[in-house]
From Swiss-Prot:
CDD domains tied to this protein: T3SS_Flik_C
InterPro entries: Flag_hook_Flik (IPR001635), Flagellar_hook_control-like_C (IPR021136), FliK (IPR052563), FliK-like_C_sf (IPR038610)
Gene transcribed to yield this protein: fliK
Species for this entry: Buchnera aphidicola subsp. Acyrthosiphon pisum (strain APS) (Acyrthosiphon pisum symbiotic bacterium)
GO biological process: bacterial-type flagellum assembly
Keywords: Bacterial flagellum biogenesis
CC per GO annotation: bacterial-type flagellum hook
Assigned protein family: Belongs to the FliK family.
Task performed by this protein: Controls the length of the flagellar hook.
Parts forming coiled coils: none
The name this protein goes by in its record: Flagellar hook-length control protein homolog
Disulphide bridges: none
Length: 235
């Protein structure tokens, strides 16, 4: 009986030792982790481990972190905008020189589009540019006794600069076709709503011009038909 009691005590002692060792291991592991990453119960700060071995840390104020994303977005937007301007500039600059073949061809195409609109009695013209990021050129045309007043609207300052250098070429092109360029104005429409309104007005005017032309053509054909029709008179 005494021997059985000793065995029980020994087992209890061994179990306690094992439990203590296990607990000590857990504590050691926790201490190790705690040494690597310090936990701060403070909502105003966030700690990011930079180097766990050396236990180096970067501390950010959470209020400032909220400001970082808008700053990055703003810088990114500025970079995109800057790249877009450089991209447009890279396309426009080769056309600025009047000596280049491409510049002359471009000027001829714009002049042809304007002359075509005038001959069709359109009061507006739209010139598409390639690449599409250059936008379009909208031209308002006012004609009276073969005297033209033109207004150009572009989306980019670089295109406006090109149009400024293009005006003498257009003046000569119109003059060769018996049209005098009395006045011209070149402006930039950077506001989306303003440009959208102008586009809507452009297509609306084109629709009404086409409609009037079709009506006039139909009336002319009807008059010609009446003129050509012979009437036989029997007595």
């Amino acid at each position: 009986m005494h021997e059985s009691s000793n065995i029980k005590k020994k087992n209890d002692f061994d179990f306690k030792n094992l439990k203590n060792k296990t607990l000590q291991k857990k504590i050691n592991v926790f201490d190790t982790i705690k040494n690597h990453i310090k936990i701060i119960n403070n909502e105003e700060k966030i700690i990011l481990p930079l180097n766990i071995k050396k236990n180096k840390k970067i501390v950010f104020d959470s209020k400032n972190i909220n400001k970082i994303n808008p700053m990055i977005s703003k810088r990114h937007s500025c970079k995109i905008l800057s790249n877009k301007k450089e991209f447009i500039k890279s396309y426009i600059e080769p056309f600025m020189s009047s000596d280049t073949k491409n510049s002359i061809e471009w000027k001829k195409l714009i002049s042809h589009k304007i002359l075509l609109s005038i001959s069709n009695k359109y009061n507006q013209a739209k010139i598409h540019l390639k690449p599409e990021s250059l936008g379009s050129i909208y031209v308002s045309i006012s004609m009276k006794n073969n005297i033209a007043t033109l207004k150009f609207i572009s989306e980019h300052n670089e295109v406006k600069t090109f149009l400024d250098s293009y005006m003498p070429f257009l003046y000569n092109s119109l003059k060769k076709n018996g049209i005098k360029l009395k006045e011209f104005k070149i402006s930039i429409s950077s506001k989306k709503n303003q440009l959208k309104n102008y586009k809507n007005l452009f297509y609306k005017n084109i629709y009404y011009t086409d409609h009037i032309k079709k009506t006039l053509n139909w009336n002319e054909k009807k008059i010609d038909y009446i003129k050509d029709k012979t009437i036989d008179v029997y007595v």
